[in-house]
A protein has these predicted regions:
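Short coil/turn connectors at secondary-structure junctions
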Residues: 1, 6, 31-34, 70-72, ...
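Conserved, mostly hydrophobic/aromatic
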Residues: 4, 39, 75
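Glycine-rich, proline-tolerant flexible connector loops at the mouths of alpha/beta enzymes
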Residues: 5-19
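Alpha-helix-loop-beta-strand connector modules within alpha/beta enzyme cores
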Residues: 16-38, 164-165
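Domain-level signal for soluble alpha/beta catalytic cores
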Residues: 27-41, 46, 70, 149
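Conserved anion-binding
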Residues: 44-148
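A C-terminal functional module that forms or caps the active site or interfaces directly
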Residues: 153-170
């Protein structure tokens, strides 16, 4: 199947009408049989992270009715706040059979300011890759995890290292 990745910020800048357009975009793409990756890059903790996860990937109960918010198939998540920020998303993914793409090594020019920092002899992105593999081990599909990684194609050598660290992640 083919996938699309609408960037939510391009819709958010237009306020409520923009968010309504985002929902229409997601619904239209799903009607066409496309996999929808919500490029939301959320990162928060506790109940806030859970609310983002439910709003984009899960269902919320209101009285006797259940609603799916934006209803993407996958969402992008920023892991900077650690497991407190990722676990609520992973829980919703397990429950709803949805997925995540966690930022590991991004392609933007300044990504190395943090992602390439050496910690315990290895770059930070390798440590993040290990956490993605751990989180992913708890969310396995047939062969691959529902938890994947964002790894910029502009860094093929780093990609090879990360593939070894995360062999079951897309």
């Amino acid at each position: 199947r083919q996938a699309v990745k609408p960037q939510v910020a391009m819709y958010e800048q237009f306020g409520i009408p923009g968010m309504m357009a985002f929902k229409k975009t997601v619904d239209y793409c799903r009607e066409k049989g496309l996999v929808v990756i919500g490029d939301i890059k959320r990162g928060d903790i506790g109940s806030t992270s859970e609310a983002y996860a439910v709003g984009h990937l899960g269902k919320v109960q209101v009285g006797t009715k259940e609603y799916a918010g934006f209803d993407e198939d996958f969402a992008t998540v920023n892991p900077y706040l650690g497991s407190d920020g990722v676990n609520p998303f992973a829980d919703v993914c397990k429950e709803q059979k949805k997925g995540l793409f966690i930022l590991v090594k991004t392609s933007n020019p300044s990504s190395g300011e943090f992602q390439d920092r050496i910690i315990d002899g290895r770059p930070l992105y390798e440590h993040v890759g290990e956490k993605v593999a751990q989180w992913g081990a708890e969310c396995m599909g047939d062969e691959y995890s529902y938890i994947g990684a964002v790894v910029g194609a502009t860094y093929p050598e780093m990609g090879k290292v990360l593939r070894k660290i995360m062999p079951k992640s897309y």
